Amino acid sequence: MRVAIYGITGGEAGKKECVRIVDAMRSAAAKVCKLQLRAFGRNALDFAPFLVEELRCASVDVQVKGILSAEEVMQELCGADVMLFVRGGISSRRGSAIAGIACGLPVVAYFGRETGQPITDAGVMLVSEKEEQELRDALVRVLTDEDFRAQLAKRSRLAQERYFGWPAIAENFVQALSSRS
């Protein structure tokens, strides 16, 4: 099973994110064989030594890459089973989270003040940032429950079609421009 992390915040916030990633991955590794972590994007390489070292004893296969082309991002995301998003509350303004949804991934993420539709229509399992155990439990559930993971993936694919795909975006522009006339 493969978990994707697309982008890590820099500085102290990034350190906190990596501690949360490691904590959730260790919990999942106790229940899932051959667990893989693929981290890539902004600041990922800065935290590679920490992620590799902290997950070594948990037998997690860790690979970290830097900034990738759009095609490479799509390949990484489409090769994953779930996206873990711990960069604060998920919202439609979070491009990396939208990329995971657009690739049909289940997403485990924190909810926040800006979390709402269309994110809540996608295959996102929302947890409280204040409750660390919720993140662990959510990741384990998505990785171990094949039917649940498939349901979340289906919801992400539908959200991509309804809200985030170019035809849906174009339709929204047409409606907005028509209402101005």
Regions found by a protein language model. Name each.
Residues 2-51:
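Conserved catalytic-core segment of nucleotide-activated headgroup transferases in glycan assembly
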Residues 69-80, 102, 137:
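Short acidic alpha-helix that forms the nucleotide-activated donor recognition element
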Residues 77-92, 105:
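Acidic donor-binding loop of glycosyltransferase active sites
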Residues 141, 148-162, 175:
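A short, well-ordered alpha-helix in the C-terminal region of glycosyltransferases
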Residues 39-41, 49-74:
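Nucleotide-activated donor-binding/catalytic signature segment of Leloir-type glycosyltransferases, i.e.
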Residues 102, 111-126:
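Short acidic/histidine- and often glycine-rich active-site loop of Leloir-type glycosyltransferases
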Residues 166-181:
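C-terminal alpha-helical cap of glycosyltransferases
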